[in-house]
Design a protein with these regions (language model features):
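Hydrophobic structural segments
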Residues: 1-286
């Protein structure tokens, strides 16, 4: 099949209109008319992923983070990014990134985190970016179409950034932390707030999302799950009595690569689609 068919599907489930204005999303390397048989999904394109893509003879890498992250004027071997881009281009491997469009999509990463925690009444933290329409159902398989149909019937009809929902049974912040660690399979998390703090309403922002703290507090969140945040943002959260769970940028997004690979494979059974098994978190807590 042509790469354009994969692009069309990605832009249906992760509409580019949902991406932040500063973001570099879409097809970032390659030809839309190129043939695609093997796809590799990952969080970030690095040396290990590039070598894996070449070794597995992938035709396209679908990377959550853009690569290149910023549009540039020159790509040379003077930089790591330039070296890897040239290596991918030499192997005729395309790169596509949905990034913040995937964060905010109806089935996207923030939604997946909310479902993993068992939150109910889940809505975007910031609403009003784009109204979901029946046209978004075009090109989806039956199960994906049903998912969108169900969303269109309720409050989820409004797409937006971040998520906020509530537990049917409130719990302590310590219990939320334990749940997050189990869900994301991590040993440690950074926490703002007392273990005994009562948590009912939870906001979510995968990756770097400390700008969500103000809106989370305004909407009555007792806690917010994020990947990472600056020190002063954590001070602000403490001052406003919002508990914070920092589970790591990698951990709050990497799990979704396997989910995305499964969705692409279900839509295009003729493709070989696999999540990377070589990438790893560059940060270790010792």
């Amino acid at each position: 099949m042509k790469l354009q068919a994969l692009i069309d599907f990605m832009e249906t489930i992760c509409p580019p209109a949902l991406a932040e204005e500063w973001d570099n999303v879409g097809l970032l390397l390659g030809s839309r008319s190129a043939r695609v048989e093997k796809v590799l999904t990952c969080l970030t394109v690095d040396r290990a992923v590039v070598d894996e893509a070449i070794a597995t003879e992938a035709d396209c890498v679908v990377s959550h983070h853009p690569f290149p992250y910023h549009s540039g004027k020159k790509w040379t071997t003077d930089t790591t990014e330039g070296t890897l881009l040239l290596k991918l281009a030499g192997a005729h491997i395309a790169v596509y990134s949905p990034h913040t469009a995937h964060d905010s999509a109806l089935f996207g990463i923030n939604r997946q985190l909310a479902e993993g925690l068992g939150l109910v009444d889940v809505k975007p933290l910031y609403e009003g970016k784009l109204k979901a329409t029946r046209a978004m159902l075009d090109g989806l398989d039956e199960s994906d179409a049903l998912f969108f149909e169900n969303d269109l019937k309720g409050d989820g009809a409004t797409l937006g950034t971040g998520r906020i929902g509530r537990f049917e049974q409130p719990r302590t912040l310590a219990a939320l932390v334990a749940q997050v660690k189990d869900m994301l399979q991590i040993d440690r998390a950074l926490v703002v707030g007392s273990d005994e703090k009562r948590v009912s309403t939870v906001a979510i922002g995968c990756g770097a999302a400390d700008e969500f703290i103000d809106e989370a507090a305004r909407k009555g969140a007792d806690a917010i799950l994020m990947g990472e945040a600056r020190f002063h943002a954590c001070e602000e959260a403490r001052a406003r009595n919002v508990g914070v769970v920092l589970a790591g940028h990698y951990a709050t997004e990497r799990f979704s690569s396997a989910i995305l690979a499964e969705r692409i494979a279900r839509k295009f059974p003729e493709l070989s689609v696999k999540p990377s098994v070589k990438e790893s978190d560059p940060i270790r807590i010792v």
